Amino acid sequence: MEASDSMKEDLAKAILAQIREEEIVAMSCDVVNIPSPTGEELEMGRYMRRTFEEAGLSVSWQEIEDGRANVVGLWEGTGNGKSLMFNGHMDTSNTGRETFLTGLGYKPKAVIRNGMIYGLGIYNMKGALVCYTQAVKALMRAGVKLEGDVTIAAVAGEIEKTQWSDEFIGKEFRGYGVGTHHLVNHGVLPDMCILGEPTDMQLVLGHYGTVWVRISTHGHYVHTAFTRGKQDHSSIFRMKEILAPIYEWIAAWEKKATYDGQPGVVNVGCIRGGHPWRVSRTPDRTDVFLDVRVPPTMPLKEVRISVKQLVLDLRKKHSDYGIEYETFVSVPGAEISKDHQLVKTIESCHQRVLGTAATHATVLWDSDASVMTRFGIETLNYGPSSGPRDAEGEKVAIETLVNTTKVYALAAAEICGAH
């Protein structure tokens, strides 16, 4: 039976009254103070397991590999209503050990200053894990019963990293959705999902995917003394010769990859060649690595087809350069209809909490929505942040965390049939 509008208003007020800022702040500091770079999520997982158990959730521990696990907290509904998952990654964008990142927000040590919480992971995306947990606790304290299930999944290995060759191997390189892949491959299949990536409380209805590409030139391994007049035999020289055509390809691709009025983007993320410990030798191979962003409406294979044609054209012009390529990451984009129930619900709850209409966005970054969408789990990115990261590093306003928690709590109540 549908509740009356007055009952809904009373229920909303009861739920919001149970959201406690001091608990949000305390948990935020706790999670920031636990270092959890990719591959080192174990202690963070143990913390989330204890927190879920103390909240009264049914907890599953999904071991991915030695020292890494997903933690899944389930609040089972009283019926068979719509089920909702809150999903967030525990690994952080950086390790906290980088010497060139000196801002306090790049360190796994929480600092509260001027209404902001600073610290590694608070922005991406431990703050969202806090909001999920505190939203569910508020619903429970309010005495709410739900028809559908609510799940909180704290996952490992989302950050954009991958193993490559025999040089970069190990769990610290196994990211790009490894945790959420394991999650959905092992039975966690809700009707829909809220993903609290740092969107600054905008509704991200679409985001790009990516393909990572390596293009290489080969040359001759020669002592410096014998290189006079033979500089064009160096793989670095040969890479220089093909960089201009590569950048021309990039410009064309970015135009082709336009989505929702926004052009695509390609990052030249790395160039490497030679031997820094032995520069008395010419390099036999030089590599350039590209991060090619792909709209969710375009098949990923379009990158391979286009890059292959580029390489074929380069080989015709430079037949002795030994040009080769590979694609070694492929992650699709994701989108959700503006008319989906989840989108409409978040819009309504955002309006109720903030008093202003929510805005929509299309972004060039990728998220685990790529994984869940392919498993039939409609996913919306909507989460806390307080502007882009800068020299100070990661930070989120306490007010933003509180407001996001309120929106999550009301959305779960609406979607899962609170009574």
PLM region descriptions:
Residues 2-12, 214-419:
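Metal-dependent amide/peptide-bond hydrolase catalytic core
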Residues 2-122, 140-146:
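Acidic/His- and Gly-rich active-site-bordering loop/insert found
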Residues 31, 35, 197, 239, ...:
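Residue-level signal for inorganic ion chemistry
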Residues 86, 111-164, 215-219, 229-250, ...:
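Alpha-helical metal-binding/catalytic segments enriched in His/Glu/Asp
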Residues 95-113, 206-217, 345-349, 380:
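Acidic-glycine-rich active-site phosphate/pyrophosphate-binding loop
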Residues 101, 144, 204-210, 279-283, ...:
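Short glycine/proline-enriched loop/turn "hinge" motifs that connect secondary-structure elements
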Residues 125-208, 416:
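Acidic/histidine-rich catalytic neighborhood of metal-dependent amide-processing enzymes
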